[in-house]
């Protein structure tokens, strides 16, 4: 599967069935976000002569942290950044963060956002343009909260939690790149097109996405602006509406 275009050193690496591991590179240093498995990431880094300096974890699910121990065997000094509320489920974290924390990585500020819903301690990482990076793109690593055309299942949270999280992410600058952790765009938009068959924004985007996937390319990253145009979950005006959409999507087998 071909990779999407790289922007500001942010690289998507497709692993397993549909996971996307993001690798953020500057010079010979790399940060990996939600490594599902170790081997393909080790290979990717080695082929480029890169050194792992940190791992960002959005939540505790095995297809997001499964590769971290293997990466640490190779780079034992790498920082593992994760939610303080998930210390028991991500025990190898070395830097525990909370909502509102700001850290500097690879010369850029990174802000931590509490987006609990998919899990009770899910966080996202936002790289704003800010004063020291005005030439760079705003980037969001959002794990399984906001998907391209969808949102994560509610394993530990409520529709109100997800509505709150999505509205918060949706308030980020419209040009912000949405780097989610799964390539679900086509299925999400097929479902959305069934719900809103007369919505040209959704149907037009679906046609583009279908062509992209047929060509063997990824559809990610998306953007906050694109999600406002065609993501029914982000467009939901209440937690009740979001809950109904989520329940319907959970049972959809299209």
UniProtKB/Swiss-Prot annotation:
Binding site for Zn(2+) 2: 63-64, 144, 182
Catalysed reactions, as listed in the record: an S-(2-hydroxyacyl)glutathione + H2O = a 2-hydroxy carboxylate + glutathione + H(+)
Function: Thiolesterase that catalyzes the hydrolysis of S-D-lactoyl-glutathione to form glutathione and D-lactic acid.
Positions with a binding annotation for Zn(2+) 1: 59, 61, 118, 144
Matching HAMAP family: Glyoxalase_2
Entry-linked PANTHER family: HYDROXYACYLGLUTATHIONE HYDROLASE, HYDROXYACYLGLUTATHIONE HYDROLASE GLOB
One biological process term in Gene Ontology: antibiotic catabolic process
Organism per entry: Synechococcus sp. (strain CC9311)
Subunit text: Monomer.
Keyword annotations: Hydrolase, Metal-binding, Zinc
InterPro entries recorded: Beta-lactamase_class-B_CS, Clx_II_MBL, Glyoxalase_II_hydrolase, HAGH_C, Hydroxyacylglutathione_Hdrlase, Metallo-B-lactamas, RibonucZ/Hydroxyglut_hydro
Lineage of the organism: Bacteria, Bacillati, Cyanobacteriota, Cyanophyceae, Synechococcales
Cofactor binding annotation: Binds 2 Zn(2+) ions per subunit.
Top-rank EC class of the record's enzyme: hydrolase
Enzyme Commission designation: 3.1.2.6
Pathway in which the depicted protein is active: Secondary metabolite metabolism; methylglyoxal degradation; (R)-lactate from methylglyoxal: step 2/2
Cofactor(s) needed by this chain: Zn(2+)
Any one GO molecular function term: hydroxyacylglutathione hydrolase activity
Name of the protein in question: Hydroxyacylglutathione hydrolase
Family assignment from sequence similarity: Belongs to the metallo-beta-lactamase superfamily. Glyoxalase II family.
């Amino acid at each position: 599967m071909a990779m999407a275009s790289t922007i500001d050193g942010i690289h998507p690496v497709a692993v397993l069935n549909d996971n996307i591991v993001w690798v953020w590179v500057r010079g010979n240093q790399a940060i990996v976000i939600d490594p599902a498995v170790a081997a393909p990431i080790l290979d990717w880094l080695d082929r480029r002569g890169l050194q792992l300096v940190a791992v960002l974890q959005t939540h505790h699910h095995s297809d997001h942290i499964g590769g971290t121990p293997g990466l640490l065997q190779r780079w034992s000094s790498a920082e593992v950044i994760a939610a303080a509320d998930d210390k028991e489920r991500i025990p190898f974290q070395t830097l525990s963060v909370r909502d509102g924390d700001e850290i500097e990585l690879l010369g850029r500020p990174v802000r931590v956002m509490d987006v609990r819903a998919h899990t009770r301690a899910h966080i996202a990482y936002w790289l704003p343009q800010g004063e020291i990076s005005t030439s760079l793109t705003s980037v969001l690593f959002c794990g399984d909260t906001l998907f391209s055309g969808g949102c994560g299942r509610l394993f530990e949270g409520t529709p109100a939690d997800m509505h709150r999280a999505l509205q918060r992410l949706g308030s980020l600058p419209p040009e912000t790149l949405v780097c989610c952790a799964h390539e679900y765009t086509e299925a999400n938009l097929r479902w959305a097109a069934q719900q809103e068959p007369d919505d040209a924004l959704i149907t037009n985007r679906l046609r583009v996405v279908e062509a992209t996937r047929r060509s063997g390319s990824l559809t990610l990253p998306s953007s906050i602006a694109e999600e406002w145009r065609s993501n029914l979950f982000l467009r939901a005006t209440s937690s009740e509406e979001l809950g109904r959409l989520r329940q319907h999507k959970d049972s959809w087998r299209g």
